[in-house]
């Protein structure tokens, strides 16, 4: 069964969510051996940090690693838009905006689930 999200066609119903400290490029390559067509995202990356260091290894994508999204977090629309453009240039098929992280380190900066307030 295929799933279509915008212009993205998925041949798998499996989505491996972004997990800080887990979904790095090595983990994703292992998952791809099990389900090559599953949808995955990178670990979450600070939008502001991406603007300061656009060559961040957290956005490294392997050749053929599609479909793949890059998850960003932040709360400043202009900064997030620019970070999303950088992620797109790095090869992301979609941008995943983190709006669910409840960790105090993230929410005290008005990011993650604090965006839902």
Where is each model-derived feature located?
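Glycine-rich, positively charged N-terminal anion/phosphate-binding segment
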Residues: 2-4, 19-93
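Feature marks short, surface-exposed loop/turn motifs that line or immediately flank catalytic pockets
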Residues: 48, 101-105
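Extreme N-terminal starter segment of soluble prokaryotic enzymes
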Residues: 1-4, 8, 12-13
């Amino acid at each position: 069964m295929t799933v279509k999200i915008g212009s993205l066609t998925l041949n798998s119903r499996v989505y491996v969510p972004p997990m800080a400290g887990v979904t790095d490029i090595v983990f994703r390559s292992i998952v791809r051996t099990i389900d090559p067509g599953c949808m995955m995202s990178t670990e979450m990356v600070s939008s502001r940090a991406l603007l300061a260091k656009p060559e961040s290894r957290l956005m490294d994508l392997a050749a053929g690693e599609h479909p793949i999204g890059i998850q960003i977090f932040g709360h400043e629309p202009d900064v997030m838009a620019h970070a999303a453009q950088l992620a797109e240039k790095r090869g992301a098929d979609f941008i995943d905006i983190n709006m669910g992280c409840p960790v105090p380190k993230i929410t005290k900066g008005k990011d993650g689930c604090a965006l839902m307030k």
